[in-house]
Amino acid sequence: MTQAVMLQGTASDVGKSVLAAGLCRIFYQDGLRTAPFKSQNMALNSGITSDGKEMGRAQIFQAEAAGITPDVRMNPVLLKPTSDRQAQVVLMGKVATNMDAVSYHDYKPRLREQILAVYNSLAQEYDVIVLEGAGSPAEINLRDRDIVNMGMAEMAQCPVILVADIDRGGVFAAIYGTLALLHKQERDRVKGVIINKFRGDVALLYSGIEQIESLTGVPVLGVMPWLDVDLEDEDGVALQNDKYRGNAPRDITIAIVQLPHISNFTDFNALAAQPDVRIRYIRRPEALTDADLVILPGSKNTLSDLAWLRESGMADAVLQTHRQGVPVMGICGGYQMLGDTIVDEVESGLGTQPGLGLLNTITRFAQDKITTQVNATMSGELPSWLAAAAGLPVRGYEIHMGETVLQEGCCTAMTLQKNGCSVADGAVTADGLAFGTYLHGLFDSDAFTRAVVNGLRARKGLAPWETTFCYAEHKARQFDLLAEAMRQHIDIDKIYTIMQQHQEPV
C-alpha cells in the first residue's frame, strides 16, 4: 500500500518545498519509488513537461530530487497571478480561464473530485507520495473550501508534519497558534513539527522545544539549520533573501530587473551557480551602475511591468546603460519589452503600446498559450559577447501567448526544432548589444552559458575560463547535501514510523 506524508507550514516561504525535495531524495536513496504532489500551486515560476504541460517549478525540482521525470499530475492546479486580484487558472497543464479570488474560491469545490482522482492515479504507481501544502493550514477564512492543506490531507488520508521558520522570529507562537486554529480532527493529523532555518547553538532551543511539545502534544522531529545549499526557490518573496542581492565579489556582474510580475526567475539559477558570476536582482536605477549584462526576465503581465519600468525610472536607466555599451538581454516577456511595438488586444485591452525600442520587433499577443520543450541551435554567426555561442546546441522551454516578428536591423538568434520543423526564434542586433529570446531555461545549457560568460569576460579584458561548469551535476550534489543534512538533523526513522502507522483506507 502506498505510504504518504504531507508537509504544511506555519506561513509561506518557511521551506516546505525544499524539505519536501529533501524527503523525496531520501526516499529515492532508500530505494523507494517516490513522487511529489501539490494539489494547488500559486506561482509565477513554472516549467513544461515533456508532453507540453505546464506545472509549478517546485514540483519539477522535487521530481528531479526523486529521480523521476516531472509529470503534470504532481501539480494538477496552477494559479499564475496576473494582477493583485486576478490569476490565470491552469488545470492539468493547460490554461482553463482567468478568475478573481472570489470566483475561484467558489469554484474550488468542483476541483476536489479531479484532484483526488489524479492523486490516486499517482499513488497506484509509487511507493511513497510526498505532499506539500500551501501557505498555512490555519487560514480559517479559507477552510471550508480548502483543497491544498488539511482539505488535501483529508482527501489523501495522510499524516501531516508542520514546518515552522525560526529565522523570521516567533517560531513557538507560530507553531502554537497554527495548531490552536485547527479543528481537532485536523490537529490529530499533525504528527510532528520541524523547526527550519535555525542559526546558532541548538541547545538554546531545548527548553522551548520541551514546552511547545508539552503545550501541544506534538513532537518536534528536528531542527534544521540554515543550509548553504543551492536549490530553487519558488516564491517571489525569496528574492528578498541575501543570496539574490549579489553581495559577493565576482569577475562578472549580471543585473536582473526584478519586475513586479517577474516569472521564471529560476531561469538564472544555472547562471548564478557559475563560479565567476554575481547575480543581482535590482529594482532601483542606481543599482545598474556596475552591470556587465542587464537582463529583463519573464513577466506574467508584460504591459503592466513595462509601465512600471517607465514609472520607476528603470527604463531610462536600462537605455542609458545600453548607450554606454552594456548589452541588454530579454527573455520571454522581457524580450517583448525590448522591441519597438507590443500589440495587446487579448490580455489588457491596451491596444498598441511602444516598447523600449532596443530591438526592431513587433509583438502581437494571442489567445493560445504556447507550452513546449524544445531543442535549438544558436545561429551560426553571432556578434560581440555572443560570438563564442554561435552554432551551439541549447535546450529550453516556451511559455508565452504571443508572436514576435523581426523587422529590418535584427537577425534571428537561434533555430528551434518543433514538430519536425525548424522555427526561427529570438532577435539580436548587429552590434550584439540587444538580444532577446522566448526560450526559458537557456542557461541550463552548460556550453552556451560558459560561452556567453567568457564573452563578457573578454569585453573586460579577462581571460576565459576553460572549464565548463555542469549544472546538472551541481543540482544532484545539492540534493544529496540536503538529504544528508536532513538525515543528520531530523528523525527520519520517526517519519517512516509516522507513515507506516498512519494507514487509512482510501
Curated annotation (Swiss-Prot):
InterPro entries: Class_I_gatase-like, CobQ/CobB/MinD/ParA_Nub-bd_dom, CobQ_GATase1, CobQ_N, CobQ_synth, GATase_3, P-loop_NTPase. Disulfide bonds: none annotated. The keyword Lyase does not apply. Keywords: Cobalamin biosynthesis, Glutamine amidotransferase. SUPFAM superfamilies: Class I glutamine amidotransferase-like, P-loop containing nucleoside triphosphate hydrolases. Catalyzes amidations at positions B, D, E, and G on adenosylcobyrinic A,C-diamide. NH(2) groups are provided by glutamine, and one molecule of ATP is hydrogenolyzed for each amidation. This is Cobyric acid synthase. The lineage of its organism: Bacteria, Pseudomonadati, Pseudomonadota, Gammaproteobacteria, Enterobacterales. The gene is cobQ.
